[in-house]
């Protein structure tokens, strides 16, 4: 059963999400488990200090390496080696292929940054991969860690009610965007569902969906369309 361990200064912000919706269902089914650890608990001084001023000057504070390293090493003694990812705006963009990899990984550790970021020696010493959700900056990595966990866990067979849901998502297999979806009523505010979708002709429906997905990808994400060629 895959274990996702999230290292954060704000476990109370993360733990409720891990017990809700798809993530909670996966845990109840015994298909995934989570551990949320406050790395401040591994600070050695009486003030439980986890940050300090940056060498070379500049604004903000930098996370010290010692408490985080102690936390990671304790977890690896408890459970064994983890694949370690640090959330960081300067990291590699998170994409669906990585979610697919993580869904098949036995132990994943997600480190949530704060302040100006991490001491680089920590990332180098413990062989962290750095991952970013996008070209913007948040105050911490907690939202990113929760997003990555859900993106991976929902791909584990048996988590979703129908495994085809994950196989037909946008980006599956490194592909393009998903096609438009419709449900009842057939007409809403004079907007009608495309007739092909209730024609009963499954081949025509597949072709229509593939064409609409390609059109949407070219319009909204031409970079993905280029990758498909």
Label the model's feature ranges:
Residues 118, 122-167, 171:
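Structured adenosyl-cofactor binding patch, chiefly the S-adenosyl-L-methionine
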Residues 64-114, 120:
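S-adenosyl-L-methionine/SAH cofactor-binding core of RNA-modifying enzymes
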Residues 5-7, 35-37, 83-85, 108-109, ...:
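Hydrophobic/aromatic beta-strand patches that form the interior of the parallel beta-sheet core
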Residues 43-46, 51, 55-69:
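A short aromatic-anchored loop/beta-hairpin motif
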Residues 2-41:
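Glycine-rich, flexible N-terminal cofactor/catalytic loop recognition
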Residues 172-228:
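Long, charged alpha-helical interface segments
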